[in-house]
Amino acid sequence: MEFLDEFPTMGRSDLRDLKKSIDGGFREFSRTYGEGLENFFDPLLHFLVWFERLLVNTPWPIVLGAIAALVWFGARSVTMVIATIVCFMVIGYLDMWEDTMATLAIVSVATIICIAIGLPVGILMARSNKFQAAITPVLDVMQTIPSFVYLIPVVMLLGIGKVPGLIAVCIYALPPMARLTNLGIRLVDKEVLEAATAFGADYKQKLFGVQIPLALPTIFAGVNQTIMMALSMVVIASLIGVAGLGVPVLRAVSNQYLALGLMNGLAIVALAIIFDRVSQRFGRRMQSHREEGAGH
């Protein structure tokens, strides 16, 4: 009955040897290719540092004006612009301006990278069922594995710093972009595609002239999810040297500072709401513009 009482497990020595072999193999890989990977990501590091310094060192009225202009361009809403200005004024007044600019820099760069990778991956998934079947398990792993787990190999390869944190954010935030791009393209009405084919459109013309424009609401939902997940990683990424609003939150947790944690947490929420509302309205506006153009 011992077999039923205790689940059969690998011997401790065998399990220890297995773990040692995995750790040893990855350390050897890190020693061999770590420097090359660091050199590969150097341009990304320089760009991120430059963008962060640009936001931090530029006079705040100019930064606030630029943010308000971007919000107006995306949302075309005076209310949204005023709400954004008020949020950033409160954030600055509570001495969180520099941390907010650092967070804004890493989230913006991570979102751009996720869109640049996720959009083509989603298009390929929509084009090929085999590619979708192959890449879906990878996206599942990226989305479900605890974020602390993939911090380990990233830190072992690249050490502590901005780039490892950025890579961790991108790994976590990329899957929604690819999934929803694939979904949006696949949901385009087949009759519309047949009509485009009847008018002599080739694959590229159908993709960029029909499928992607009609899939924009779903694609922008993917952008929204990517931004939200990138912001949710800010606190975790601060564990490996990423500056921003996550650092005070960690300090507040360690020292039980309720006010500090609450203020910085609400600043992250404010950024999330602004990004979300602006991207949603921009997506709807582009879709309505396409529909009006098609009507004429």
Per-segment meaning from a language model:
Residues 1-105, 112, 284-296:
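N-terminal, non-cleaved signal-anchor transmembrane helix
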Residues 69-73, 91-98, 110-139:
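Transmembrane-helix boundary motif in ABC transporter permease subunits
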Residues 99-103, 123, 133, 137, ...:
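Membrane-spanning helices that line or support transport/gating and their immediate boundary helices
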Residues 106-109, 114-117, 123-126, 139-173:
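Generic hydrophobic transmembrane alpha-helix motif, especially the helices
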